Amino acid sequence: MDLLSNLPYELLCHILSFLTTKEAALTSVLSKRWRNLIAFVPNVDIVDHDIRELFMDFVDRVLALQGNSPINKFSLDCSGVDSDRVDCWIQNVMVRGVSELNLSIFVDSVFEDDYNLFPKVFENKKLVKLGLSYISWLDGSIFLPMLKTLVLESVLLSVEKFEILLHALPALEELVMNNIYWKERDVVDLIVSSESLKTLTINFIVCTHTLSFDTPILAYLSYSGYVVDDYAEAKMENLFEARISLLVVEGDISRVRALINNDLLEDDEYDVLQFENVWKLMNGIRNIRCLYLSPNTLEVLSLCCESMPVFKNLKSLSIKSAENRGWQAMPVLLRNCPHLETLVLEGLLHHVTDKCGDACDCVSREDKGRSLTSCPVKVLEIKGFQGTTKEMNMIKHFLEYFPCLKELKMYMEENDPAQLRVPEVITGEMMERYKKSSSCNVQLLVGGKLYKKWTP
């Protein structure tokens, strides 16, 4: 007999809990001892979008086999099933004390005849984590005193019900909102308010007019979405880390640049003036220690330079660049981070204008490098490095003007043509350029191999 079959039942069930329920059921053919193990597996994870009747019969058999045994996690990912039977499945696991419930019930049309969530889902004193996808409506009373994590994806909501829901979750620590649609077809003023929330992830909320945050102990924010008309309130005093990725269309970028250059047509002013309100969002996160900005976000911030807050606690700043997005806001960002220690640049190539600022060497200026000389950054990381002459010149510019720089780390972009060259040649060229910067340690990672230049 093999060693695996000799393991205790408890350990075998723990191993099976890492498989989907269908995969776990298939192990019953291994031996008689394995035949009924599925009845004792504490996690049920069911995914099926094919033969609907057979699928529903399978779920019925699994739950019947498990009887009243305790259950920790129930995940259901399916489409086109009988809503009454789904309600029975949910009721079954809730009676058995499920603490994590994930439901993704998809129908053929978007939010047409979607599965209406079993109302008792929101009356459970043991539920700790709840994930809902493709659910069209949340209704009924709410009693989830232990819920810590709520994940909403492709869900159709009422703003009023959503705000009531948040206030009814006293233990909520993590909220994830992906592709949220609102039942209100007119102007939507959304307030994310929670006294207990620590982690918030927002990806693409549709048709929102204003967005406010009242989250006094929030520690982590990941926000990706189109710029709303106004960020009316942003109470995030205890925020530690933020990732901001604003979405814009190409026409908006053209209008932003025209406004900066005083070339914007009067009819287009309204379309971009809302971008100036992004400063309110930035002001709300001013106490952070770690900040990540996308290329679009950096470009939009060019309209907020005069109102940019001082990030007095910021230690690590990560900025992703794109060749078609500008660095106009880079100088003010560096000047407004008086205690910055680590700067991470994901790419160096960017859209060059005469207002690109003094942070790079793209345009000859009298105040070249001024924003760098006042920046206390000690570690500079360059990711996606391609080994071009333009990049190497820019890095040399950083080495010359960052007065406190102690360490430079460069990561060659994977699968980049530059890697086809002899690494020693690339390294030799770079070290020759940077040999005068003797006060800084330089590291270059090429194809998994690390090259170093250490100071004495």
UniProtKB/Swiss-Prot annotation:
Residues 1-54 form the F-box domain. CDD domains: F-box_AtFBL13-like. PANTHER family: F-BOX_RNI SUPERFAMILY PROTEIN (PTHR31293:SF25), RNI-LIKE SUPERFAMILY PROTEIN (PTHR31293). This is Putative F-box protein At5g38390.
